[in-house]
Amino acid sequence: MLPLYLLTNAKGQQMQIELKNGEIIQGILTNVDNWMNLTLSNVTEYSEESAINSEDNAESSKAVKLNEIYIRGTFIKFIKLQDNIIDKVKQQINSNNNSNSNGPGHKRYYNNRDSNNNRGNYNRRNNNNGNSNRRPYSQNRQYNNSNSSNINNSINSINSNNQNMNNGLGGSVQHHFNSSSPQKVEF
């Protein structure tokens, strides 16, 4: 059982909390949020020294009584619960589950990812949905290769004309001229 889940179901129970600075707070839990920030009522707060010494000593006068206190979850060192609180929470959860499942209009909603034998295939599309217009991508691939030989021939002629430009001395400028209309380039 997760600590946050335990605390949310333990509202109304007496508990003792030690903070990171050594203070001890005793009270009744009234509210818990997702960051484990607590609100306690009927609170007694003890400083570090009075918690260490016995209650018969004069140091016990450092105890402070408060109606309510709010404690940030980041300041909590540990929480001491009553011995039987886990059993009470389990009984409370079971009684809530039994009362909710027998009510009228009760439906259980399951995660649809696990249905239709698609376990583990969450990102795959099911193309067998009865829609004949949808085909897998591989069946729709068609290439127009009629001009590919002409393109390859022109690329080869450009590369053979410009091989003397690429002499390994760094970058070079390659000019592509049409043989039917010669052009002059001045540098």
Curated annotation (Swiss-Prot):
SUPFAM superfamilies assigned to the protein according to its UniProt record, in alphabetical order: Sm-like ribonucleoproteins
Cellular component GO terms held in the UniProt record: cytoplasm; Lsm1-7-Pat1 complex; nucleolus; nucleus; P-body; sno(s)RNA-containing ribonucleoprotein complex; spliceosomal complex; spliceosomal tri-snRNP complex
UniProt function note: Component of LSm protein complexes, which are involved in RNA processing and may function in a chaperone-like manner. Component of the cytoplasmic LSM1-LSM7 complex which is involved in mRNA degradation by activating the decapping step. Together with PAT1, the LSM1-LSM7 complex binds to osmotic stress-activated mRNAs to attenuate the osmotic stress response, probably by limiting ribosome access to the mRNA and consequently translation. Component of the nuclear LSM2-LSM8 complex, which is involved in spliceosome assembly.
Gene3D superfamilies membership: 2.30.30.100
Extra remark: Present with 3440 molecules/cell in log phase SD medium.
Omega-N-methylarginine: residues bearing it: R119
Gene name tied to this protein: LSM4
Plastid listed as a keyword: no
Record's signal peptide: none
Keyword vocabulary terms for this entry: Cytoplasm, Methylation, mRNA processing, mRNA splicing, Nucleus, Phosphoprotein, Ribonucleoprotein, RNA-binding, rRNA processing, Spliceosome, tRNA processing
Self-association and partners: Component of the heptameric LSM1-LSM7 complex that forms a seven-membered ring structure with a donut shape. The LSm subunits are arranged in the order LSM1, LSM2, LSM3, LSM6, LSM5, LSM7 and LSM4. Except for LSM1, where a C-terminal helix crosses the ring structure to form additional interactions with LSM3 and LSM6, each subunit interacts only with its two neighboring subunits. The LSM1-LSM7 complex interacts with PAT1; within the complex PAT1 has direct interactions with LSM2 and LSM3. The LSM1-LSM7 complex interacts with XRN1.
Protein name, UniProt field: LSM complex subunit LSM4
Subcellular location: Nucleus; Cytoplasm
MF term (GO), any: U6 snRNA binding
